[in-house]
Amino acid sequence: MRALIALLAGVLVGCANTPTPPLALASQVDLKRFMGDWYVIANIPTFIEKGAHNAVETYRLAADGTIETTFRYRADAFDGEEKQYTARGFVREGTANAVWGMQFIWPFEADYRIAWLAPDYSQAVIGREQRDYVWIMARTPRIPEADYRRILEFLLRQGYDVTRIQKVPQRWS
């Protein structure tokens, strides 16, 4: 009986320590095509993004090869206070430009991974290996519901808790 209990305990411990497979990555990212404005369609928000409306992330390739990033949104309502944050992205070598270190405060860099990218660069999913945050982004403020559902299915397969994903209100005139 003790041997059976020890065996079961070992199996349970082994299951608890099963590593999460690596997050999928876009196979190749053309940085010049990726640059520009991206509307945040949905996310698992960071503390600064909670209540964001009309959220847009803008990327610009700097002369030194880093990526100047500006995130702007309206706080808590479409007519709320406009907020803006900047960061700098550092592309990791050997990742087909899909993995960046995103620096909001020197010298710290946050994990930033282009997990999925539409072939026409119209939609993208940005994730983190920890699966704690995710951003569904598009070149337009809205995407078809079928596309949104497919992206949620992709994220579920990647190990995300999709019940935490919230749509970001977008209204542009």
Language-model regions, residue ranges each:
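Sec-dependent N-terminal signal peptides
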Residues: A3-L12
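A beta-rich soluble binding module of mature secreted/lumenal proteins
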Residues: C15-S173
